């Protein structure tokens, strides 16, 4: 039977509950246990698919097409286990499910209430499908005290009573701020956060305390006394250089041992930390460095590109180099010459995005990379802009544009209205809802055997994750290829372009999908590993 770990957060948001959950899962995996992680998000959106990147950060897409919280990306990268639709739930989905049941008459005329109907729906989500796992870690989004989180906290309180004794453990992540004027760390915010949690009926078994400096033993004893947890269960979570140092740091502090002790598992299998130690060693002992320009449109919030950032660092791990990121807002190039920004970098990456803002700047970045022979990696929107650039400047189609921006006469990029998903034909209307109406999830692509990208993958058949409504128009394929832009990858039915590249360029590849979503520190995505390798070659020329 699965054991459950519920992870809550207090004092402030953005403390790193997702990283903590992922790190603990990795530590339990290192001991040979089978682990699943689930995220419970209190917001009323059905999913984050229509939320602004500035509000929510990245939307992480799973193989089965779920648009989920970015924390699921951490879960995948730390554990290697692909997430799915059933690993993320929101208040919006909970209420939608309940309303659908009420309309069908499933409640037999009962008054539908938060307790028991909403809490029961949450509990069903937590408990469903866990037969093959030893541990299920559930991260509760938000902060203790948030109104939106109350039904979720009540649900996990009930589960603590309903599950067999010894199969549920509560971890509370808090902040211990340092006050320079007093010259000391303060325990009071954590005390109040635990008091709030206990008033709900949840007594934390373990405190995971974030701090920017060593927590004195006297302060640990104070937290133990006033928060009613064992002193050994007050675990300090100090700031570290990279997120991949977290599992090692938490293991040294005894987090995994304390969790197993709370479950009464003694003795426990010894952990194998060698691969985490190897990743940490490579990160802290690079044999060189490269600089990659990321020409984006949400650069004000780096969380909007979380998986992309990590995938670039994975590419650095594969090549034993440090990857420095130079963030450039694409709109800058609409009024300034790109050359001063780009001529010293070793590679240019244009990531995905939506809408017209910044599009011309991304087109100019692609033009600079093509003409100057700088390694270029265009992802989703970045591939589309590279095709528009080629259509304008190589084919001579001056009005080449995307129908996403305006009803252009030359829609090199246009709205997809239908595509194959397996043996099923999926259709979308231009006037339909935004939520869940994109080409989402893993799709197959067929690569030309003699293409550069096929050599990088070592295969002509690939499966990658997509998230887009617009696609390069197949009607322009022949003219673009005649100008030198090779359509190296297509959907199996030959209708949807998946990858493009220039044969006469050291490294210029555009992909319609999002390879960053499948990159792992232990298995860097081949495209990112190859891109960083090309950047290393470029660094010798600059």
Curated annotation (Swiss-Prot):
Q: Name one Pfam family in it.
A: GATase
Name of the top EC class for this enzyme: ligase
Where ATP binds, per the record, is at 14-19, 71
Stated EC number for the protein is 6.3.4.2
Return the annotated region ranges for Amidoligase domain. Answer: 1-265
UniProt keywords (A-Z) are: ATP-binding, Glutamine amidotransferase, Ligase, Magnesium, Metal-binding, Nucleotide-binding, Pyrimidine biosynthesis
Q: How is its activity regulated?
A: Allosterically activated by GTP, when glutamine is the substrate; GTP has no effect on the reaction when ammonia is the substrate. The allosteric effector GTP functions by stabilizing the protein conformation that binds the tetrahedral intermediate(s) formed during glutamine hydrolysis. Inhibited by the product CTP, via allosteric rather than competitive inhibition.
Query: Which residues bind L-glutamine per the record?
Result: 54, 353, 381-384, 404, 469
**What CDD domains does the record tag this protein with?**
CTPS_N, GATase1_CTP_Synthase
Q: Where is the Glutamine amidotransferase type-1 domain?
A: 291-541
Q: Which pathway is it part of? A: Pyrimidine metabolism; CTP biosynthesis via de novo pathway; CTP from UDP: step 2/2
Can the keyword Cell membrane be found in this entry's annotation?
A: no
What are the GO cellular component annotations? cytosol
InterPro entries given in the database record: Class_I_gatase-like (IPR029062), CTP_synthase (IPR004468), CTP_synthase_N (IPR017456), GATASE (IPR017926), GATase1_CTP_Synthase (IPR033828), P-loop_NTPase (IPR027417)
Binding sites annotated in the UniProt record for UTP: 13, 186-191, 222
- GO molecular function of the protein, one example? identical protein binding
Catalytic activity annotation: UTP + L-glutamine + ATP + H2O = CTP + L-glutamate + ADP + phosphate + 2 H(+); L-glutamine + H2O = L-glutamate + NH4(+); UTP + NH4(+) + ATP = CTP + ADP + phosphate + 2 H(+)
What does the record list as GO biological process? 'de novo' CTP biosynthetic process; pyrimidine nucleobase biosynthetic process
Task: List residues binding CTP.
Answer: 13, 146-148, 186-191, 222
- Catalytic machinery residues: 380 (nucleophile), 514, 516
Q: What job does the chain carry out?
A: Catalyzes the ATP-dependent amination of UTP to CTP with either L-glutamine or ammonia as the source of nitrogen. Regulates intracellular CTP levels through interactions with the four ribonucleotide triphosphates.
Family named by the database record: Belongs to the CTP synthase family.
NCBIfam families reported for this sequence = PRK05380.1, PyrG
Q: How does it assemble?
A: Homotetramer.
Question: Other remarks on record?
Answer: CTPSs have evolved a hybrid strategy for distinguishing between UTP and CTP. The overlapping regions of the product feedback inhibitory and substrate sites recognize a common feature in both compounds, the triphosphate moiety. To differentiate isosteric substrate and product pyrimidine rings, an additional pocket far from the expected kinase/ligase catalytic site, specifically recognizes the cytosine and ribose portions of the product inhibitor.
State what protein this is by name: CTP synthase
Organism field: Brucella melitensis biotype 1 (strain ATCC 23456 / CCUG 17765 / NCTC 10094 / 16M)
Classification lineage: Bacteria, Pseudomonadati, Pseudomonadota, Alphaproteobacteria, Hyphomicrobiales
Q: Gene that codes for this?
A: pyrG
């Amino acid at each position: 039977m699965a054991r459950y770990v519920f992870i809550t957060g207090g004092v402030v948001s953005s403390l790193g509950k997702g990283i903590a959950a992922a790190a603990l899962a990795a530590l339990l995996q290192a001991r040979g246990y089978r682990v699943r992680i689930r995220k419970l998000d209190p917001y009323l959106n059905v999913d984050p698919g229509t939320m602004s990147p500035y509000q929510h950060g990245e939307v992480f897409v799973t193989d089965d097409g779920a648009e989920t919280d970015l924390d699921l990306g951490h879960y995948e990268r730390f554990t290697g286990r692909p997430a799915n639709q059933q690993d993320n739930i929101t208040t919006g989905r909970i209420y939608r499910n309940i309303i659908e049941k009420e309309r069908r008459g499933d409640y037999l005329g009962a008054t539908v209430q938060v307790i028991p109907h909403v809490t029961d729906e949450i509990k069903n989500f937590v408990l469903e499908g866990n037969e093959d796992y030893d541990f299920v870690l559930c991260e509760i989004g938000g902060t203790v005290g948030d109104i939106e989180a109350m039904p979720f906290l009540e649900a996990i309180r009930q589960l603590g009573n309903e599950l067999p004794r010894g199969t549920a453990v509560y971890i509370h992540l808090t902040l211990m701020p340092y006050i320079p004027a007093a010259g000391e760390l303060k325990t009071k915010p954590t005390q109040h956060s635990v008091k709030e949690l206990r008033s709900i009926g949840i007594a934390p078994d373990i405190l995971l305390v974030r701090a920017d400096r060593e927590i004195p033993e006297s302060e640990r004893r104070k937290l133990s006394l006033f928060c009613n947890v064992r002193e050994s269960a007050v675990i300090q979570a100090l700031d570290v250089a990279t997120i991949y140092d977290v599992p090692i740091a938490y293991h040294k502090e005894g987090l995994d041992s304390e969790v197993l002790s709370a479950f009464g598992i003694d003795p426990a299998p010894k952990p194998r930390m060698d691969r985490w130690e190897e990743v940490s060693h490579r990160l802290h002992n690079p044999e060189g460095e490269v600089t990659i320009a990321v020409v984006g449109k949400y650069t004000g919030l780096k969380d909007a590109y979380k998986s992309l950032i990590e995938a670039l660092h994975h590419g650095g791990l594969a090549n034993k180099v440090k990857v420095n990121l130079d963030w450039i807002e694409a709109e800058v190039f609409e009024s300034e010459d790109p050359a001063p920004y780009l001529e010293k970098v070793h590679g240019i990456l244009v990531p995905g995005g939506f809408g017209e803002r910044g599009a011309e700047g991304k087109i100019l970045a692609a033009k600079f990379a093509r003409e100057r022979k700088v390694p270029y990696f265009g992802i989703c929107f970045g591939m589309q802009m590279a095709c528009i650039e080629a259509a304008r400047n190589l084919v001579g189609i001056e009005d080449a544009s995307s129908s996403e921006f305006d009803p252009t006469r030359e829609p090199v990029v246009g709205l997809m209205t239908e595509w194959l998903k397996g043996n099923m034909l999926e259709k979308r209307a231009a006037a339909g809802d935004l939520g869940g109406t994109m080409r989402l999830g893993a799709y197959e692509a067929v690569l030309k055997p003699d293409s550069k990208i096929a050599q990088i993958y070592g295969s002509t058949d690939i499966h990658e994750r997509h998230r887009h409504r617009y696609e390069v128009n197949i009607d322009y394929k022949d003219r673009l290829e005649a100008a030198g832009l090779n359509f190296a990858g297509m959907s199996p039915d030959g209708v949807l372009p998946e990858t493009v590249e220039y044969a006469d360029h050291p490294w210029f590849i555009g992909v319609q999908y999002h390879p960053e979503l499948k990159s792992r520190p232990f298995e860097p995505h081949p495209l990112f590993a190859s891109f960083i390798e090309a950047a290393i070659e470029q660094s010798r020329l600059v």
